[in-house]
Regions:
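Helix N-cap motif at beta-to-alpha junctions
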Residues: 108-110
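Short hydrophobic/aromatic beta-strand micro-patches
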Residues: 104-106
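N-terminal, polar/charged subdomain of small-to-medium soluble alpha/beta proteins
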Residues: 1-99, 112-118, 122-147
Length: 147
């Protein structure tokens, strides 16, 4: 029996716009797809107690996170009639304004792609062991809470 390969979703550093564009372009040959949904999570320059966030440093418990994401992926394919799902999460220090999460779902119909993308994002935020350390302009920090 063939051993299951778990997809690596982690990218060191920010997710670059060119990578996102390439991912979209690769789907032009998949003519059974009628709709895509994309979520891009971007680091915000929040002001907290008078201090501005300049970056978020993301860390994870890699194996646990990959196993959990594989479970989420399987559940999304079982629940929704999606053709493709791609998930990329940044690790390391990501500056305000840069993309740190990229979720891309595809289906024959737009509503399915949109619903699957939204649920996937919500589950990633709630269930994946990924932590963000908000780094302020003065180099102080606090641990981020997902919401």
């Amino acid at each position: 029996m063939k051993e299951k390969v778990i997809k690596n979703i982690f990218v060191e550093g920010a997710i670059e716009p060119a990578f996102i564009a390439e991912s979209i372009a690769k789907h032009q040959t998949k003519t059974n797809i009628g709709g895509h949904s994309i979520f891009l999570g971007q680091v915000r320059a929040d002001v907290i107690d008078g201090r501005s966030v300049s970056a978020i440093e993301y860390t994870t418990y890699n194996q646990m996170a990959l196993e959990k994401m594989d479970q989420i992926r399987e559940e999304m394919f079982n629940k929704y009639s999606i053709t493709c799902m791609h998930v990329y999460q940044s690790l390391g220090k990501i500056s305000a304004g840069q993309v740190c999460l990229f979720v891309f779902t595809s289906s024959k119909h737009r509503k399915v792609a949109i619903d699957a993308c939204e649920e996937t994002v919500e589950r990633i935020k709630a269930e994946l062991p990924v932590w963000g350390k908000e780094i302020f302009e003065d180099e102080s920090y606090q641990w981020k809470e997902n919401n």
